[in-house]
Amino acid sequence: MTTLADLRINYSRASLDEADAAPDPFAQFDRWFKEALAAKLPEPNTMTLATVGADGRPSARIVLIKGVDERGFVFFTNYESRKGHDLAVHPQAALLFYWIELERQVRIEGRIEKTSAEESDRYFASRPLGSRIGAWASEQSAVIDSRATLEAREKAVSERYGDNPPRPPHWGGYRLVPDSIEFWQGRPSRLHDRLLYTRDAAAASGWTISRLSP
């Protein structure tokens, strides 16, 4: 087995101070996301989505963020997938963005709601044709007997709908409405900077900021 104990990096690129932090986490996230884009990181919109099933078993996977505003963080998927079933019984989730090149993480927790049909339709129409066909062809997370079966379904959907497949009823968007967002900046000697935004109706910005021990 490969020895792992000595694999480590001493983080030193930047700091995160309360005086420099935006008053609300959406503005802070926008700032960091723009910096990730400017740094030309590969797919900075990738995030880990963690859910819990009816049996209490957690699961996590990488998904793509497709929208962020003051209402929350939006992603799209198959409602009949494992994550879809998890969210149907436990509409709470956690997101994690990890931008290792900038030595940064963003951890987000909150409740899940479906986006409107109009939002889902609008995003679905913007997807490449192959992705729209794939949304029909794939029974996401279901067992299939072979790759050939999947490709046969893809061909059948393409022949049925041509260049204009509608959005499947089992496919659409979710919005995570956060109640806490943590920004993590790596620092030397593992004494990292961690600022936690928590919803607070009494605060002027609607959020309070706390520094967490690393």
Swiss-Prot record:
Residues that hold substrate according to the record: R8, I9, N10, Y11, K66, Y123, R127, S131, R190, L191, H192
Known cofactor(s): FMN
One Gene Ontology MF term: FMN binding
Keywords for this protein: Flavoprotein, FMN, Oxidoreductase, Pyridoxine biosynthesis
Enzyme Commission numbers on file: 1.4.3.5
Binding site for FMN: 61-66, 76-77, 82-83, 105, 140-141, 184, 194
Gene3D superfamilies assigned: Electron Transport, Fmn-binding Protein, Chain A (2.30.110.10)
PROSITE patterns: PYRIDOX_OXIDASE
Top-level taxon of the source organism: Bacteria
Residue spans crossing the bilayer: none
Subunit and partners: Homodimer.
HAMAP family linked: PdxH
Protein name: Pyridoxine/pyridoxamine 5'-phosphate oxidase
Biological classification of the source: Bacteria, Pseudomonadati, Pseudomonadota, Betaproteobacteria, Burkholderiales
